[in-house]
Regions:
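Short secondary-structure junctions
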Residues: 37-47, 95, 287-291, 319-324
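Acidic/histidine-rich catalytic neighborhood of metal-dependent amide-processing enzymes
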Residues: 103, 112-184
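N-terminal helical capping/dimerization or prosegment-like subdomains
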Residues: 1-83, 257-263, 270, 274-281, ...
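Metal-dependent amide/peptide-bond hydrolase catalytic core
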Residues: 1-2, 81, 172-176, 183, ...
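A structural signal for isolated positions on well-ordered beta-strands in alpha/beta enzyme cores
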Residues: 43, 72, 134-136, 289
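Short beta-strand segments
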Residues: 74-76, 136-138, 167-170, 194-196, ...
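Active-site metal-coordination/substrate-binding segment of hydrolases
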Residues: 68-134, 363-366
Length: 380
């Protein structure tokens, strides 16, 4: 498979390979065809079963001189479903001229096939003797993330290829390329609450047990909790009720069960299990059961060598001194942080997951130069 070395052509080739999560196949063929000619040994493997799988993962390694440092780029090739209402095909990689410069449209242009294309082009300009470089690429970041980066980490450890530093290409920039770098993320835990009672006729409440008042009282108590006031690098933790369901369509029936769902995004004052235990203890007073799923603990790569070299590279190419932040949702950095220090930096996120997702061609070009500077600095 012959591919142009131009960053737009590479981003287009990735976009044109549809890869709605969980991703396998063609898009990884494109990725391998980009990396193999650059001297990378590419290992691909598929794990998982429906509905969360199968998922394809890729680890590519270009070995540097003995004893050299090891820098890794990480990202995902899976994308969210395109939805309706696109002005051109979501996988057409439509390049359009606009008053502010050319834009490349397509699902994944921002999140994050554009960034991955920039990574590849950046590495192409780095000689092998500069050091060891790897790519940690999954097809399961936008989904449950069960069969993606976690088994990749297991493989990397098994082959003794742990990097010294990893950069994740998530779209961290807000208003313009370079204005924000992520050095950590809050933790995330979801909980399902079930209050059980006894069904009955509304005219005979003494023969029933209505679970709704108990669940409402529980939610009110939880909503009133102030978890913390934030910390040095994190915003305030927040608990949000995200669903309330009874499913009772009859006007004269007291339901037997009421359910709710909540999500907590929390900072480094907490762990997920402590929060689950706290909610469970409160729920017990209201005779309500709790089931929880932890999606990742809060983490931070404290400002230091890694953040300094990323910031310096960004400022050298954009003139912007980026803000170091821990805001936003979760990413696979929550897994990679167990492997090595990790920082996230990438394109502007205004159109990610939206209809007509698009990236400025100029941003792709500048991002390539930023990634090249970061890699060279990390290897030096």
């Amino acid at each position: 498979m012959a591919l142009s070395h131009d960053v737009v052509a590479r981003a287009s080739a990735l976009i044109e390979a549809p890869s709605v999560t969980p991703a396998t196949g063609a898009v990884f063929d494109v990725m391998e065809a980009m990396l193999a000619p650059l001297g990378f040994a590419v290992h691909r493997f598929i794990v998982g079963v429906p509905p969360e799988g199968p998922v394809e993962n890729l680890f590519a390694l270009r070995q540097g001189p003995p004893g050299s440092r090891h820098f890794a780029f990480a990202g995902h090739l899976d994308v969210v479903p395109p939805g309706e209402g696109w002005s051109s095909g979501p996988f057409a990689a439509d390049l359009r001229q606009a008053p502010g410069g050319a834009l490349l449209y397509g699902r994944g242009a921002v999140d994050m096939k554009g960034s991955i294309a920039a990574m590849v082009c950046a590495v192409e300009a780095i000689p092998a003797e500069a050091g060891t470089i790897s790519f940690i690429i999954t097809g399961d970041e936008e989904g449950p993330a069960k069969y993606g980066t976690v088994p990749l980490i297991d493989y990397i450890r098994a082959v003794n290829a742990v990097p010294d530093f990893c950069l994740v290409g998530e779209p961290t920039s807000v208003h313009r390329l370079g204005d924000m770098v992520k050095i950590g993320r809050r933790g995330s835990v979801n909980m399902w609450l079930t209050a059980k009672g006894a069904q009955g006729h509304v005219a005979y409440p003494h023969l029933a047990d209505n679970p709704i008042p108990r669940l409402v009282a529980l939610l009110a108590e939880l909503d009133a909790i102030v978890l913390d006031e934030g910390s040095a690098w994190f915003q305030t933790s927040n608990l949000e009720v995200t669903d309330l369901e009874v499913g009772n369509r009859a006007t004269n029936v007291i339901p037997a069960e009421a359910r709710a769902r909540l999500s907590i995004r929390y900072n480094d004052h907490h762990t997920g299990q402590v929060l689950v235990d706290r909610v469970t203890a409160i729920a017990a007073k209201h005779r309500t059961e709790v089931r929880a799923t932890l999606h990742g603990e809060a983490f931070i790569t404290l400002p230091g060598v890694q953040s300094a070299l990323v910031s310096a590279a960004v400022e050298a190419e954009t003139g912007i001194a980026p803000e170091l932040s821990t805001t936003g949702g979760t990413s696979d950095a929550r897994f990679l942080r167990a492997l090595c220090p990790v920082i996230e930096f990438g394109l502007t996120n205004a159109t990610m997951h939206k209809t007509d997702e698009a990236v400025a061609v100029e941003d792709l070009t500048v991002l390539t130069q930023i990634y090249r500077r970061i890699a060279l600095s990390a290897l030096s």
